[in-house]
Amino acid sequence: PNAVEPTISWVLAEKTILIDPGHGGIFPGRVNENNMLEKDINLQIATTLEQYLAESGANIMMTRRTDTDLVPETAQTEKLLLQQRADLETRIQLSEQYNADYLLSIHCNSIPNEKWHGAQTFYNPEDIESKNLAKAIQSSLNNQLEGNEREALPREGTYLFKNASTTTVIIECGFLSNPEESSKLQEPAYQQQLAWAIYRGLQNYLAE
């Protein structure tokens, strides 16, 4: 075993991390031609990530643990767009309520072109910590996942980035629009690989 491993694990102790499986409930997220729902994949990867982080002594919170949205009752009669906004606002409120050090939002990508593939991180262009954390997680994803060669990118105008005071990174775990990748994203072993890569990226960032 690597001698530095205990030291690296220790960096997560006492850190409060909010894991946010994107979408849920009335919001399926991306849906591919085989009716794979992004919300389900997000939750499976997030739950595995929670296990890895909890074992390292971090204080872990989840925005959801079941197939539910986070629209408060007061907004449930609003138009869908306003419900989506309210759902995101609840996620931000949770990050503040838990006094989270980091908010990791787990998603899957999809575009009208089947050729694109790979897991990719996005960061808040106004937050240097968000950028550095996204780059560390991206580096880990590229190291752990065969053929993954994407780079961390800023994402302008994202509601989470514009409104969360917590250092936030969005992780798009792959493309549901790519048949081969969407098939892998359903496999527990691949979900574990993704979760492990995210976990190690966070470790590496904190160990720097």
Question: What feature does the model see in each segment?
Answer:
Residues 1-208:
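Catalytic-site microenvironment of enzymes
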